[in-house]
Amino acid sequence: MRDGKKLRLGYTTGSCAAAAAKAAAWMLLSGSKKESIRLLTPKGMELTLAVEDIHLSPNCVRCAIRKDSGDDPDITRDTLIYAEVRKTETVGIVIDGGQGVGRVTKPGLDQPVGAAAINSVPRRMIQANVEEVCGLFGYIGGLYVVISVPDGETLAKKTFNPRLGIEGGISILGTTGIVEPMSEQALVDTIHVELRQRRESGADYVLLSPGNYGADYIKGAMGIDPATAVMTSNFIGDALEICRELGFRGVLLIGHIGKLVKLAGGMWNTHSRYGDCRMDILTACAAAEGLHGGAAAEMLCCVTCDDALRLLKEQGLYDAVLHRLAGRIDDMMHYKCSDIETGAILFSKEYGYLCETKGASKLLRRIKED
């Protein structure tokens, strides 16, 4: 809800690309125009989307789906996402990016260097939906699918893509296929309600985590029910202040280094639109431990935290820098909430457990007992 109004859902660029590809494949194999197309998203919600700007020929069809972001602020709102599908002599479905879809130029991202920046889930959606159409028409030949975004190169300048090493356009993204509107106050209010419920039920200690990565780690590496944790999204600072106001005795934060490293720089809202200081902070910690010259410059240019950690291992500074980072996060959390116990545990998808602040293990034991 926002100002008493129920917020409207949207759909991702990945859903648009998959729907456009499905519609183009249907028209190519049927020889008829299709004005709308149904798409089942990974979230389980079915969409019926209008098909726009149809160009139909015997061996190739091009069409578009217009991006609807719902009530979420999004630079791709109303952008046309195109798919062109053509028959090929080779068996199988090949997916590529065309105009306005970025190309990966640095390692460490969802797709390999040289590939179109169409992430894994959208690729699977495109593949599955085109295969569905092929099965419907009994087609066993090959298809070449090209996703394009005519405005993509211009839009990409407003994103972090150029810095991440994605050049020439936007990324085709989405894990659920659905865009859920982000009303900041609504999210903070939800966090407050959940924390108040925990406190009123008698909990003195609480576990926080930013989101799905943290929940997966809590379950897989620690054997704790993820429902034990309160999800903070990017609002870590707000969540800590709410914990203090409600009278919790202690708070443990478990999260991916890509989020929690920002706390060392005093960034309490970790959304990328407020800035991206991950490599700056890691490089500063590394410099304090002796990293200098070309290696420091290389770290500043790393795309992901795992890339930076790999460099630290090569330089023999891995443990020292993580220890310093944990100390810095400990200082900042204590400054934020000096009257309650605070702790943090950091992990990465590639390296698993990384480091923890002083007292984090004790807090974890108390949360398990609470």
Go through the PLM ranges and name each one.
Residues 1-13, 27, 31-34, 135-136, ...:
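N-terminal charge/polar-biased segments
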Residues 8, 164-170, 175-194, 198-324, ...:
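A structural signal for small-residue-enriched, beta-sheet-centric alpha/beta enzyme cores
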